[in-house]
Regions:
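Surface-exposed beta-strand edges and their flanking turn/coil or helix-capping segments
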Residues: 3, 9, 44-48, 73, ...
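Polar/charged side chains located within well-ordered beta-strands of beta-rich proteins
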Residues: 4-5, 15-18, 64, 92, ...
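Short, low-complexity, Pro/Ser/Thr/Gly-rich segments in the mature regions of secreted, periplasmic
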Residues: 150-164
């Protein structure tokens, strides 16, 4: 068994849940969120797969769209500021569809293919960010923590080849 992997990013992400209102603190603390980096992260297997024999075109459009949520490990008191800086709500659920097709080759890596299976995994944009704070009494920025937030961005596919 040999695996090839590729990502399909979806720009038509549909937000499907209501926004949760931000909790505002009454303190005089000001938080600053600084973006550090953004990477792609492969999530859980969706349970969706399709397989076929050589010469058959396996269609991804037969797979249904799935809904999965954004998430974060950010502290509740800086969540609103972090969401505004990154541009998405960490509590929303997103529905992402996918479509396309791939023909199963008769040979792969010089070997005869018995069948191939295409498996779909969730794909996230993972943002890492740093939070600092100041107040009316503390002017020098103080480190508060480093956090992450993930937003659904598409699907990661694994094409598994089984040989004769």
């Amino acid at each position: 068994e040999v695996v090839e992997e590729f990502n399909v990013f979806n720009t038509d992400v549909i937000e499907t849940t209501e926004e949760i209102p931000d909790i505002q603190t009454r303190s005089h603390i000001t938080y600053k969120v600084t973006k550090l980096n953004r990477t792609s992260e492969i999530g859980a297997y969706t349970g969706q797969s399709v397989s076929g024999e050589p010469g058959v075109t396996i269609s991804l459009s037969q797979m249904k769209a799935t809904s999965f949520s954004a998430s974060s490990n950010v502290a509740w008191n800086v969540k609103g500021k972090a969401q505004a800086t990154l541009g998405f709500n960490f509590s929303k659920s997103y529905t992402i569809g996918h479509s396309g097709s791939r023909k199963v080759p008769s040979t792969h890596n010089g070997r005869k293919v018995k069948r191939a299976e295409l498996k779909a995994y969730r794909l996230y944009d993972k943002h890492t960010f740093k939070v600092t704070w100041t107040s009316i009494h503390v002017k020098q920025p103080q480190y508060y923590g480093t956090y992450w937030a993930k937003k659904p961005s598409g699907y990661h596919y694994k094409m598994v080849y089984y040989y004769k």
